[in-house]
From Swiss-Prot:
Substrate binds at L134, V135, S136, G137, G138, D167, G180, N272. Its EC number is 2.3.1.234. GO terms for biological process: tRNA threonylcarbamoyladenosine modification. Its cofactor is Fe(2+). Binds 1 Fe(2+) ion per subunit. This is tRNA N6-adenosine threonylcarbamoyltransferase. Signal peptide: none annotated. The keyword Secreted does not apply. It catalyses: L-threonylcarbamoyladenylate + adenosine(37) in tRNA = N(6)-L-threonylcarbamoyladenosine(37) in tRNA + AMP + H(+). It is found in: Cytoplasm. Required for the formation of a threonylcarbamoyl group on adenosine at position 37 (t(6)A37) in tRNAs that read codons beginning with adenine. Is involved in the transfer of the threonylcarbamoyl moiety of threonylcarbamoyl-AMP (TC-AMP) to the N6 group of A37, together with TsaE and TsaB. TsaD likely plays a direct catalytic role in this reaction. InterPro entries: ATPase_NBD, Gcp-like_dom, KAE1/TsaD, Peptidase_M22_CS, TsaD. Fe cation binds at H111, H115, D300.
């Protein structure tokens, strides 16, 4: 079975083809970072228009990369939510139209389920059950995963997501959009311990997160300690350490609560090297395992959508006859396979 995956939930146009026997056959990605950089964030209307321009050419490029034609595609999977409504509608409309023209099923995919399943694309995929840390610009969640569609929300951010906090703090430090990766690069040059940021909500029970206060703490620290290059690097280091420690503490609690031995980390922030190293060290001490996707599959991409669509189709998902998107779509509402 070969599935064409279409991802257009935000500011990346991702197209991929996944074969259940041969694996990933094609992966095309276009990023709109330069388009939105002057605005300091994603402009929804510009994002939608750029998806219109790029989606079909990238599908053609993916078919060429795989050496396939439309007749070789058995299903089309597209991101139906959550995300920006205009951007989602582009991918959904193209996906549903192609499926109709090619007479194959059209499978709507939950964007965060795509992220959650992305580590399954690797050579050593995680087995169920596991705790999943979904950590990105729009989401920070801990999920108990016992099977496809068997998701229990354990905790989530009550305000800013971790990735959003990274980007906002990076802007305070004078870094360009998207600032998260640049902040991490700056943090690598910082002095450990010069500044100590709080670890939000770790002094009380529960698995929820709160990161908005770290941005305020960073703003006050910047204002009170000057703006030379080393000070900015030290502040970046303190901020990153606080976020990573907070995520690690909550992951440990989730593992203790569930009794699971496997931790899956997914989403754009899961590419953070410090976070990967800290969680790997923690899981080694606990006698467990941590799993994550390669960096290019941590951020938005078509490969995870193609794979998630294939899994859903194989487990009995019904093809969509209409074009429907859900900008807000709780993961827990997905049906169990």
């Amino acid at each position: 079975m070969r599935v064409l995956g279409i991802e257009t939930s935000c500011d990346e146009t991702g197209i991929a083809i996944y074969d259940d026997q041969q694996g990933l056959l094609a992966n095309q990605l276009y990023s709109q970072v330069k388009l939105h950089a002057d605005y300091g964030g994603v402009v929804p209307e510009l994002a939608s228009r750029d998806h219109v321009r790029k989606t079909v050419p990238l599908i053609q490029a993916a078919l060429k990369e795989a050496g396939l034609t439309a007749k070789d595609i058995d299903a089309v999977a597209y991101t139906a939510g959550p995300g920006l409504v205009g951007a989602l509608l582009v991918g959904a409309t193209v996906g549903r139209s192609l499926a109709f023209a090619w007479n194959v099923p059209a499978i709507p995919v939950h964007h965060m389920e795509g992220h959650l399943l992305a580590p399954m694309l690797e050579d050593n995929p995680p087995a169920f059950p596991f705790v999943a840390l979904l950590v990105s610009g729009g989401h920070t969640q801990l999920i108990s995963v016992t099977g496809i569609g068997q998701y229990e929300l354990l905790g989530e951010s009550i305000d800013d997501a971790a990735g959003e906090a990274f980007d906002k703090t990076a802007k305070l430090l004078g870094l360009d959009y998207p600032g998260g990766p640049m902040l991490s690069k700056m943090a690598a040059q910082g002095t450990e311990g010069r500044f100590v940021f709080p670890r939000p909500m770790t002094d009380r029970p529960g698995l929820d997160f709160s990161f908005s206060g770290l941005k305020t703490f960073a703003a006050n620290t910047i204002r009170n300690n000057g703006d030379d290059e080393q000070t900015r690097a030290d502040i970046a280091r303190a901020f990153e350490d606080a976020v990573v420690d907070t995520l690690m503490i909550k992951c440990r609690r989730a593992l203790e609560q569930t009794g699971f031995k496997r931790l899956v980390m997914a989403g754009g922030v899961s590419a953070n090297r410090t976070l990967r190293a800290k969680l790997a060290e923690m899981m080694q001490k606990r006698g467990g395992e941590v799993f994550y996707a390669r960096p290019e599959f941590c951020t938005d991409n078509g490969a995870m959508i193609a794979y998630a669509g294939m899994v859903r189709l194989q487990t009995g998902a019904k093809a969509e006859l209409g074009v429907t998107v859900r900008p807000r779509w709780p993961l827990a509402e997905l049906p169990a396979a």
